[in-house]
């Protein structure tokens, strides 16, 4: 039953009439806010019109990057006009994330997504030490701008297990550091499940990227794992992921990171997120 619709059944109680039909709330209704990556919007409109499109599709916010070429002024204007929040900036693997931190503060965001890249010419230990130094250097500016730096689990990182990523975050010893947990990346290049990553990262998780490469419509079935068993026709066992997120009382932003498109496509992504996140 679609929890976003009124129940159609009522119970007559004597002459008092029919009971009002309540709206069913999902497990994470009111706890997770829906977002997507700005690059997923594939329509030529003004920024305000694009944000209006997101609002109609039932999104609450969006993430941008320096590569999008958006000025802080136009972003703020679009947010004021639509109430679509720009909650974060995607930086990636570059060593200097100061510009991303500044942009995040200027648009009213709270986090910058950072990757700890694997350099082929370095050993695991040297990659670990190098990335720790890079992120540590960025912490003072992040703290000054009231922005958190979130490490994401990606294919190009040397952090190949949830345990390694948790240790990396813990060694930074800063409340400005957290985890950006990507549900799909856990399966694509590791032998661990999405729920295992969620369990190990636990309280470190600040935001979540929603992705399932094995899904027929919102993924790429050609990339589907032969061993991963999902609950939505793909690879991610969403019920187990939700269980782990609930165990740490997760609340915050979840961003779709799948193939984008026009208004109809983005509306479909939004509805899919409702389903897998139980919103």
Which residues fall in each region the model found?
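Short amphipathic alpha-helices and their capping/turn segments at secondary-structure boundaries
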Residues: 72-78, 96-106, 193-203
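Short acidic, glycine/proline-enriched helix-loop-strand junctions
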Residues: 71-89, 147
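Active-site acidic/histidine proton-transfer and metal-coordination neighborhood
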Residues: 10-19, 28, 68, 88-181, ...
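Histidine-acidic metal/acid-base catalytic patches
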Residues: 2-35, 40, 44-56, 108, ...
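Short glycine/serine/threonine/alanine-rich loop segments
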Residues: 59, 84, 109, 147, ...
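Catalytic domains of carbohydrate-active enzymes, especially glycoside hydrolases
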Residues: 50-69
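Conserved beta-strand positions in the central sheet of alpha/beta enzyme cores
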Residues: 63, 88, 113, 206-209, ...
């Amino acid at each position: 039953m679609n929890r976003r619709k009124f129940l159609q059944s009522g119970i007559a109680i004597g002459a008092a009439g029919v009971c009002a039909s309540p709206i069913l709330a999902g497990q994470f209704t009111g706890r997770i806010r829906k977002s997507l990556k700005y690059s997923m919007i594939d329509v030529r409109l003004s920024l305000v019109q694009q944000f209006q499109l997101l609002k109609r599709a039932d999104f609450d916010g969006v993430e941008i990057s320096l590569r999008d070429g958006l000025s802080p002024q136009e972003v703020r204007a679009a947010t004021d006009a639509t109430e679509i929040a720009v909650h974060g900036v995607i930086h990636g693997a570059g060593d200097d994330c100061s510009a991303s931190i500044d942009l995040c503060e200027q648009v009213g965001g709270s986090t910058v997504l950072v990757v700890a890249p694997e350099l082929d010419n370095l050993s695991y230990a040297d990659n670990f030490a190098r990335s720790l130094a890079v992120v540590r250097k960025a912490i003072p500016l992040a703290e000054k701008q009231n922005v958190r730096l979130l490490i994401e689990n990606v294919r190009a990182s040397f952090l190949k297990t949830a345990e390694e990523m948790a240790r990396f975050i813990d060694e930074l010893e800063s409340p400005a550091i957290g985890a950006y947990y990507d549900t799909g990346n856990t399966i694509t290049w590791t032998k661990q499940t999405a729920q295992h990553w969620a369990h190990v990262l636990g309280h470190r998780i600040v935001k979540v990227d929603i992705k399932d490469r094995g899904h027929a419509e919102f993924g790429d079935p050609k990339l589907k794992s032969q061993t991963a068993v999902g609950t939505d026709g793909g690879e991610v066992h969403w019920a187990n992921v939700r269980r782990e997120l609930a165990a740490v009382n997760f609340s915050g932003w979840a961003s779709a990171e799948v193939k984008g498109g026009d208004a109809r496509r983005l509306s479909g992504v939004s509805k899919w997120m409702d389903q897998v996140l139980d919103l």
